[in-house]
Curated annotation (Swiss-Prot):
NCBIfam families: PRK01827.1-1, thym_sym. The active site is at residue 161. This is Thymidylate synthase 1. It catalyses: dUMP + (6R)-5,10-methylene-5,6,7,8-tetrahydrofolate = 7,8-dihydrofolate + dTMP. Transmembrane segments: none annotated. It comes from the Bacteria. (6R)-5,10-methylene-5,6,7,8-tetrahydrofolate binds at residues 184, 278. The gene is thyA1. Belongs to the thymidylate synthase family. Bacterial-type ThyA subfamily.
Length: 279
């Protein structure tokens, strides 16, 4: 049993047994297949903590880990909002939110790429500022990136679910705390938890720190009603030992990472489970 499997199953069980339904409300989300309202059961304010002795990825079902990393590179490295850039990587998970101009508006990578921080007399974006500050001002309590920009929320195809990171350097270790305003536990959470841990490992490597603790906070923690049956099946499945994530140790620049610099070794998992998408 992995740390992630254990915490994940505990939260799913809590939601199914104690979650509050939103069926009395008109909801924004609709089922992609038929356009009917996509209702949820939810609980609020959940936290997952990992000591990073193992990579947090589910073993009770197959997680498309390469797709998760490609999405991460699209947002954090390319700082792109262009869905075509993601399609070029063979990834189509954002196609439902693609606008007429081919982008997701001013969301995700667009916010990270805005040059709105001052550094040595120049304007830099959030990622470059973070990397510089972690190396040169490690004791700062201001190592934060923010995707939730109130001035531009209406210009986003989808407001960010994972919206904030805060980084801490303590005794030579790089700790990461992530905040998600909302998490779809069947589809979004397994991706997000894994990919932001990969981000932590990447940034620790290029800044020269050891890997510290990883904390993932969720505001609205929910399960869509059409996902419940398959989640119950998933919770009863055999759990395996965590795999090993290999990251090419030769990469010293954050922008030099490619998908070929990652390998998931000995990833044993249950069969893939299909969960319908709500948009």
């Amino acid at each position: 049993m992995t740390q992630f499997d254990k915490q994940y199953n505990s939260i799913i069980k809590d939601i199914i047994n104690n979650g509050i339904s939103d069926e009395e409300f008109d909801v924004r989300t609709k089922w992609d297949s038929d356009g009917t309202p996509a209702h949820t059961l939810s609980v609020i304010s959940k936290q997952m903590r990992f000591d990073n002795s193992e990579v947090p990825i589910l073993t009770t079902k197959k997680v498309a880990w390469k797709t998760a990393i490609k999405e991460l590179l699209w947002i954090w490295q390319l700082k792109s909002n262009d869905v075509n850039d993601l399609n070029m990587m063979g990834v189509h998970i954002w196609d439902q939110w693609k606008q007429e101009d081919g982008t997701i508006g001013h969301a995700y990578g667009f916010q990270l790429g805005k040059k709105n921080r001052s550094l040595n007399g120049e304007k830099v974006d959030q990622v470059d500022y973070l990397l510089h500050q972690l190396k040169n001002n490690p004791s700062s309590r201001r190592h934060i990136t923010m995707l939730w920009n109130p001035d531009e929320l209406d210009a986003m195809a989808l407001t960010p679910c994972v919206y904030e990171t805060q980084w801490y350097v303590k005794h030579g270790k790089l700790h990461l705390e992530v905040r998600a305003r909302s998490n779809d536990m069947a589809l979004g959470n397994p991706f997000n938890v894994f990919q932001y841990n990969v981000l932590q490992r990447m940034i620790a490597q290029v800044t020269g720190y050891e890997l510290g603790e990883y904390i993932f906070n969720i505001g609205d923690c929910h399960v869509y009603t059409r996902h419940i049956d398959n989640l119950k099946i998933q919770m009863e499945r055999e759990q395996f030992e965590a795999p090993e994530l290999w990251i090419n140790p030769e990469v010293k620049d954050f922008y030099d990472f490619t998908i070929d610099d990652f390998k998931l070794i000995n990833y044993k998992h249950g069969d893939k489970l299909l969960f319908e998408v709500a948009v």
